[in-house]
Structures are given as structure tokens and as C-alpha cells.
Design a protein with these regions (language model features):
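Short, well-ordered alpha-helical segments
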Residues: 34-46
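Short, Lys/Arg-enriched N-terminal segments with co-localized hydrophobic residues
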Residues: 1-6
Length: 75
């Protein structure tokens, strides 16, 4: 559909612990011009976040990163 090409998407990321079942508050990963751009940024940001958290902490606390791309209403 033609209208979807102009829709923008906001990247929402979250770090969670499978050990505790808790998650940190959602983080705004910015607005992207397409679903593809948002999903690609989410994938890259997930890898970067894992690297920043570090292997030891990720393993110890069973951390994982999730993301979603929500449409920006009115954009």
C-alpha cells in the first residue's frame, strides 16, 4: 500500500533478565523512516547493548535485549 511507505517507526528497546523476570524501563531508540530501517537498527543496537553489558554480566544475570518498532502516529 502506498501510504505505508511514508509511515515512520519508533524503535523501543528493553533489557530484561531471564533470571529475575524483570526488565529495565523501555528506551527510545529513535524514529526511523521505514520498518526495515527500524528493525535493522534494533538488531544492531541489540548486539551493541549485549557487548556493552559484557559477557560476564549477561551470563550471570541471564540478560537479554528486546526491541519493537511502533508506528509513529501522525507522522
Amino acid at each position: 500500500p502506498k501510504g505505508l511507505s511514508t509511515m515512520k517507526f519508533i524503535l523501543i528497546m528493553k533489557i530484561c533478565s531471564a533470571l529475575s523476570g524483570n526488565c529495565l524501563p523501555e528506551h527510545n531508540g529513535g524514529v526511523h523512516n521505514s520498518w526495515y530501517d527500524c528493525a535493522a537498527a534494533g538488531s544492531l543496537n541489540t548486539l551493541n547493548a549485549m557487548a556493552e553489558l559484557g559477557k560476564e554480566d549477561v551470563n550471570k544475570r541471564k540478560l537479554f535485549v528486546t526491541f519493537k518498532c511502533d508506528p509513529v502516529l501522525g507522522a
